[in-house]
Amino acid sequence: FKAKYLSESIDSILNQTMSDFELIIVNDQSPDDIDSIVFSFNDSRIQYDINEKNIGGTDLILNWNKCCQKAVGDYLILASDDDVYSPDFLDEVSCLLERFPKVSLVPGRVRSINEEGAEVEKDHLFPIYMPQDDFLYYASRGMISVQAQYVYNREKFMKRGGFINFPFAWNSDAATAYMMSDGGVLSTPSIVFTFRKSSIHITGDGSIKKQDSEIDC
C-alpha cells in the first residue's frame, strides 16, 4: 500500500541467495504510484496483481488471506512493503527445514530500525528448535514477533484458515504463529530480517491500511 520503502523491500527479496521462489505483489488500490516501482523490476519471478477495490482499509486480515490464497509453493511468507530481508534469509530457513521437515513455522531472527535506517534493537538468540510451550514462553517474555518474519507451511496454514481475524488485525500475527507452532518452531541463529519502525507503519499511526506482498518458495 505504501511506496516509500517498497523498492528496497522488493530488492531485498529478489536478491536472495536462494533463487527458487515466486514473489506475488498485491496492490490494494494504493494512492501511491506502486505500478512504476513494480515495473522497474524486470524479473520473471514477480507476479503483480491489483485488487479491484481496497480491501485492507476495512478488513486487513481478509486482504492478507486473499494474498496467501495466490500462493502455490510448499511454504509462504506474507511480506510487508517496508521491511528488509537479508540475502541469506531463505537459505537459512531452507537449511533448518531440511533438518526438521515436520516443523511448520520458522521465524527469522529480527532486528528493528527506525525510518533513517539506524538500528533500534535486535532480538535475542533462541534455540534452533523450540517445542510449542517453549515458543510461548519466549514470546511472553519479549521475543520480537512481526508478521513478515514468519515462514509458514502453506498446506497446513491454508487448511487452518489462514490468519486469525481479530479486529484491526491487532495480535492476529502472533495468534496465527501460535496456531502454527503445535509441531514446534525453528529459529534462525543469524539475524536475517529487518523490521522498520515507521510513522507510516500500521503500528505507528493506528491505520489498518497496509499493502502486503508475498514470497512463495
Language-model region placement:
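Short, acidic, metal-binding catalytic loop of nucleotide-sugar glycosyltransferases
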Residues: 11-20
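Glycine-rich, basic loop-to-helix element that forms the pyrophosphate-binding segment
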Residues: 52-71, 84
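Short aromatic/hydrophobic "clamp" motif used to bind/position activated sugar donors
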Residues: 76
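The conserved acidic donor/metal-binding loop of glycosyltransferases
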Residues: 80-84, 109
